[in-house]
Amino acid sequence: MSHNLKQLFQQHNVKGLSINSKTVKDKDIFFAIKGRNTDGNDFIKDALSKGAVLVITDNKKNIVIDKVIYVKDVQAALYEAIEIFYPKKPKDLIAVTGTNGKSSVVSYIAQTYSLLGKKAASIGTIGVEIFGCVNLINDVPELTTLDYLSFRKIAHNLAENGIEYLVFEASSHGLDQARLREIKVNIACFTSFSQDHLDYHHTKENYLLAKLKLFINHLLPNGIAILNSDIEEIEFVKDYLHNHNVKFITVGTKGDLEITRLNCSLKGQNINFTFNNREYNFNTPIIGSFQASNLLIAVLSIHYIGFAFDDVIDSLVEVKAVKGRMERIDNTNIFVDYAHTPDALEKALTELKNIKLRDSKLSVVFGCGGNRDKAKRSLMGQIAAKRADTIIITDDNPRHEDPKLIRAEIISGIEKADYTEIANREEAIKYGINNLKQDDILLVAGKGHENYQIIGDKKLPFDDAEVVRKCIKVCHPVA
């Protein structure tokens, strides 16, 4: 088939490949693939109307349409076309999985590469970020782990523009659905593990095994896994990887790289650790003990790619916090964080509670997303009641669920603690800011970097950090 595909590309002056009729561009080939929820064959005419020069399908019913070509296996044809059209990748690849911390680690790794004078990029929840050169990528699908075509297209574009190092997030959904196909990485990282996505995986064991596919299916034979030693299931993970002949090293309070002491404040933290029988310490403006682990996972990732350990450590002082990840807004005591799981919310609240002044109060504004894991909602209410002094329950991205019912499920876990329920997220944030007293801390949790709110089918502009800034101008908080 290779010869035929190459001929087709030349004959029709093909400019690109597409599996989504919404993103088809002039001179693209559209591959009509049947997915989990939609069938590309239903959108053939739409793709042609947008400029597709050809459509490839394995559904014989559609070959009566002009410009439609039948093949026995459309997926195989797509993969063959990708190898012809988007063959290049950056020379070194690192993948990061984990319930929480993926976005932070990929950003820290890419930032550090740049600080070491290398051209690097990251792909994940926040999108494509390019360090050391201008931004080259537009129209990125909103998935933590991209579909295989999108990934290869972006990786090829990056390599064509001189990007040497690529680090990306690997979600449990993406791994379970084999979106990465045959992609192999030099380093694979595991940041954290706790309950999430049970609406998809059904059990925590299935969820964990999906994560571990990264190390079994995608790590090069001479590659290394970098694991957070403080994961509750770490012994199972180590045994599982050992049984599959995967080399690994651990980071954490009981790791091969051992975190020995943290001194945290609202301005940042001093991190002390030992590695290879040497003691180290460095300062960072990034807040949170969990971020200490994330930073050091990033350090080992780059070290095992081939960079001198001390050079990597020296660059850490310039690594910046990631948007929406324990992001301190304009030097106030107001933080925006993506914490949307029970574990992430507990860690964020615990960190802020530990660094607040004794007589000050900790407030939290949060909700839960609709059409997602319902089991975590009451747990998050329970955690807020345990860790925060003031609780404000609001809407997150309700999607197609009744937001009032989502809030009720959160509130069911709060039990005896006081709370305030304000459906409108902006009003909830404003209420939280207005009620701050001297030295109080406010955490706005759940949406982090997102610049939208999904209500039904509508995706409305909304940015927690910008709403906080707007409220600060009006409210003049004392924090």
Swiss-Prot record:
Pathway: Cell wall biogenesis; peptidoglycan biosynthesis. One of its GO terms (biological process) is peptidoglycan biosynthetic process. Meso-2,6-diaminopimelate binds at R372, D396, N397, P398, R399, G446, E450. Its EC number is 6.3.2.13. Catalyzes the addition of meso-diaminopimelic acid to the nucleotide precursor UDP-N-acetylmuramoyl-L-alanyl-D-glutamate (UMAG) in the biosynthesis of bacterial cell-wall peptidoglycan. ATP binds at G98, T99, N100, G101, K102, S103, S104. GO terms for cellular component: cytoplasm. One of its GO terms (molecular function) is ATP binding. This is UDP-N-acetylmuramoyl-L-alanyl-D-glutamate--2,6-diaminopimelate ligase. Carboxylation is probably crucial for Mg(2+) binding and, consequently, for the gamma-phosphate positioning of ATP. It catalyses: UDP-N-acetyl-alpha-D-muramoyl-L-alanyl-D-glutamate + meso-2,6-diaminopimelate + ATP = UDP-N-acetyl-alpha-D-muramoyl-L-alanyl-gamma-D-glutamyl-meso-2,6-diaminopimelate + ADP + phosphate + H(+).
